[in-house]
From Swiss-Prot:
InterPro entries assigned to the protein according to its UniProt record, in alphabetical order: Ribo_uL30_ferredoxin-like_sf (IPR036919), Ribosomal_uL30_bac-type (IPR005996), Ribosomal_uL30_ferredoxin-like (IPR016082)
Biological process, per Gene Ontology: translation
Alphabetized UniProt keyword annotations: Ribonucleoprotein, Ribosomal protein
GO cellular component, one term: cytosolic large ribosomal subunit
Protein name: Large ribosomal subunit protein uL30
Gene that this polypeptide is encoded by: rpmD
Top-rank taxon, per record: Bacteria
Upper classification of the organism: Bacteria, Pseudomonadati, Myxococcota, Myxococcia, Myxococcales
Family listed: Belongs to the universal ribosomal protein uL30 family.
NCBIfam families tied to this protein: rpmD_bact
Originating species: Myxococcus xanthus (strain DK1622)
Known partners and oligomeric status: Part of the 50S ribosomal subunit.
GO molecular function: structural constituent of ribosome
Amino acid sequence: MALKVKLVKSFAGASSDMLDTIRGLGLKKFGDERLLKDTPAVRGMAFKVKHLVTLETVSGDAPAPKRRKPAKIALRERAIAYQAKQNKA
């Protein structure tokens, strides 16, 4: 099971706790939607900001979150590729 969480109201003037909760749900701006695993933690976070979000239960699993490479690793890979390109020329 998964939960579709959508930010339907502006969080202007919300307390810092609510802002942290909204960020924790992965919502960044008005109208954002996220498909999250249905866990007690996610339900509790959604309950805390229930006046700002809508919840919808969706069948199936939530997709695994995309992970970015840390900046140091990405920079190192670009440097190695650049050096390899320079050595060929």
